[in-house]
């Protein structure tokens, strides 16, 4: 398991990144997501069913960043992409318009990556996504993020992700997304 040393002035705790039984800790993970992403209880209830369904997909894996007391500070999960999955069916036309729909084949999708705000900016997100993709067995990774200049998009760019399609509209999402892709392994900095 990877250890992230804490900055004594900003983060007195050490986070450990390792396998996460996301099905068993789904409520705790979604609490982190709700705080980090600003979603309400109704949306959390919808996402709970989605997460549990995703965990049944072949190759789905999850990692968590935990404090020494076992508290979940962040999590990531993903799976090998399947063109038949809802996400792929939504982004395919946007990727095709940019000549990038080939990225839907042979890619590992980062489905969710969230770090509690108290632990953001300290390497937990970078450690989670890098550890997950390091052992996915595929040559590239794709993800979607809200299409704005944000710490998340800056993190992804620093890891080698580039825009494959922008202004992607998901049903019921209030803001457009960008689909990003990167060759694996992700660079270390």
PLM-predicted stretches and their roles:
Residues 1-13, 80-86, 90-91:
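Acyl-donor-binding surface of acyltransferase catalytic domains
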Residues 12-31, 39-42:
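A short beta-loop-alpha structural element at the N-terminal edge
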Residues 39-69, 73, 77-83, 98-99:
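Active-site rim helix/loop that mediates acceptor-substrate recognition in acyltransferases
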Residues 60-64, 75, 107, 112, ...:
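Short hydrophobic/aromatic beta-strand element in the GNAT-like acyltransferase core
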Residues 77-112, 170-173:
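Conserved acyl-donor/pantetheine-binding loop and adjacent beta-alpha core of acyl/acetyltransferases
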Residues 110-117, 121-134, 154-158:
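Conserved acetyl-CoA-binding loop-helix of GNAT-fold acetyltransferases
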Residues 126-127, 147-175:
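Conserved active-site alpha-helix within GNAT-family acetyltransferase domains
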Residues 134-147:
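Conserved GNAT acetyl-CoA-binding A-motif
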